[in-house]
Amino acid sequence: ETAAELAEQRFDVEIVDSGTVGSHLGARARKQASRQLRRLGCTVTDNHMCQPEPGMLTIWTAGFAPVTVPCDPPVSTSSDGRIVVNRFLRSPTDPRITAIGDCAAPPAPHLRPSCASALSLGAVAADILISDVLKTPPPSNTGVGYVMRCVSLGRNCGLVEHVSPDDVPNGPVLTGRTARRVKDWVMDRTTQWLIEEAQRSGSYRIVRGPAQ
């Protein structure tokens, strides 16, 4: 996304990836993204490691690292330091602890760090905690999922890939200005969903995924 924005402003941009640019996308979406980057004049080098030369402006995007949360006493964590939780988002080591977001490792391998995950997991956690307070049974379905992946490819172009609830590409790929407008709508709604949920609890509609 950053490369496309810079290239659109007439900067010379080279993307170097130790893997494949857009590897998280399906084949059709990845092809469309590569085509747009070439159209903007980006040079793309896959499966390569390099050392930036002095004087070059380098934007390093090395992926996500979870925020570690110290607990006393310590709780079970995954290999990358996230708090292991069950399908009710509780630590099996200490059920008093509810963990959500990038610091948590739920039993759902399809979940990825994203606002889409955070919104639905936050709503599920709220339902679970409310059931604790009201002493009612917790929700039976705590699985969350996805509808699409949105990517910005410059100010006037985007990419929207439809996916199944477990994040597998399963439909058409939308590109161009229309896809960019969808991306902008999602960005605007993300903030609005939070505001509406604060004003009226339960108004956010959870995107359901595979049962955990």
Where are these regions (language model features)?
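Short glycine/serine/threonine-rich phosphate/pyrophosphate-binding segments
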Residues: 1-2, 67
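Rossmann-like dinucleotide-binding cores of NAD(P)H-dependent redox enzymes
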Residues: 2-47
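Hydrophobic/aromatic beta-strand patches that form the interior of the parallel beta-sheet core
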Residues: 14-16, 45, 59, 98-100, ...
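A cross-taxonomic marker for long C-terminal extensions/tails that follow the last structured domain
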Residues: 30-77, 208-212
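FAD-site-proximal beta/loop scaffold in flavoenzymes
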Residues: 52-53, 57-120
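FAD-binding beta-loop-beta segment adjacent to the flavin cofactor pocket
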Residues: 81-98, 142, 155-166, 171
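A conserved FAD-binding loop/helix module that cradles the flavin
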Residues: 85, 100-154, 160
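C-terminal auxiliary extensions adjacent to catalytic cores
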Residues: 155-212
